[in-house]
Amino acid sequence: MDLRGTRITVHDMTLRDGMHPKRHLMTLEQMKTIAQGLDQAGIPLIEVTHGDGLGGSSVNYGFPAHTDEEYLGAVIPLMKQAKVSALLLPGIGTVDHLKMAHELGVNTIRVATHCTEADVSEQHISYARKLGMDTVGFLMMAHMNSPEGLVQQAKLMESYGANCIYVTDSAGHLLPDTVKARISAVRDALKPETELGFHGHHNLAMGVANSIAAIEAGATRIDAAAAGLGAGAGNTPMEVLIAVCDLMGIETGVDVFKIQDVAEDLVVPIMDFPIRIDRDALTLGYAGVYGSFLLFAKRAEKKYGVPAREILVEMGRRGMVGGQEDMIEDTAITLAKASAAA
């Protein structure tokens, strides 16, 4: 398919999804430096919050180095052309968090639910629209619903007021054909003026290929992270995506070399460990398990002596979804007992 002249909006995840491998402990200085680099490279939209969205600071998800207000308050005034977005998961983030983000100057709010639970987003989406925000419905773990099922969920979010809907491959489990099937079905069902987005993870090394497949099928907003910094094996690597788009004539407005420099000079040095497809991250993609479970499973391995891979496979078998991080410990204990009894 000839995509020359196609214009997309790339949405950076480095400072939100990238909080997962950083255990939410990014410093304000790191946030500001990377955000300014992204802004200068031409990235139009940058997400900033706790990895699990506004209000994510908790025992269950992890305590960040700073509050959402502090991170947003530090980054937003520095932006020359980029707008800032925030993620909100109903049940974690509240309408009060939404108000706070709006007051600080957040442009875009992304209201995220499991891909079968769009009905819990009505309050937050409708309120964000009342505030005049760019309002996105974000359907997570999209591999766990059929194209037809996703259509119904997307239409719900659209009816609440969302002006953009995301098909979100939280587990990095989808392949180009399964991405296309979902994006095409949702694109055909939504109003022409409603935008469509895709969020990929790199657990099966498909982040870039899936993003291009999504663009072919009608997505105009694409998530990626500099150096792939994100949960699991990371998000779609932004610098690779931008280079591929440039070769294909897809217009992003992002400087090919400046975004490489942000990844190499600013993001890689702050990594606590290399973002790569190790056996556990690969298992996330293979078994279709939520990306941010990775560090929790590695932690449980150290504590209970059960390989992280076994924990993740069992989590996939049980159909666990985002937000059930507490079940990782429970699963590890169950597997350890079963192993001891064998």
Swiss-Prot record:
InterPro entries: 2-IPM_HCS-like, 4OH_2_O-val_aldolase, Aldolase_TIM, DmpG_comm, DRE_TIM_HOA, PYR_CT
Pyruvate carboxyltransferase domain span: 8-260
Binding residues for substrate: 16-17, 170, 199, 290
EC number: 4.1.3.39
Keywords: Aromatic hydrocarbons catabolism, Lyase, Manganese, Metal-binding
Site note Transition state stabilizer, residues: 16
Gene Ontology molecular function: 2-isopropylmalate synthase activity; 4-hydroxy-2-oxovalerate aldolase activity; manganese ion binding
Binding site for Mn(2+): 17, 199, 201
Gene3D superfamilies referenced in this protein's UniProt entry, alphabetically: 1.10.8.60, Aldolase class I
Single GO BP term: L-leucine biosynthetic process
Residue numbers annotated as active site: 20
Catalytic activity from the UniProt record: (S)-4-hydroxy-2-oxopentanoate = acetaldehyde + pyruvate
Top-tier EC class: lyase
SUPFAM superfamilies: Aldolase, post-HMGL domain-like
PROSITE patterns in the cross-refs: PYR_CT (PS50991)
Coiled coil: none
Record family assignment: Belongs to the 4-hydroxy-2-oxovalerate aldolase family.
NCBIfam families: 4OH_2_O_val_ald, PRK08195.1
Database matches in PANTHER family: 2-ISOPROPYLMALATE SYNTHASE 1, CHLOROPLASTIC-RELATED, HOMOCITRATE SYNTHASE-RELATED
Protein name: 4-hydroxy-2-oxovalerate aldolase 2
Source organism: Azoarcus sp. (strain BH72)
Chain's gene name: mhpE
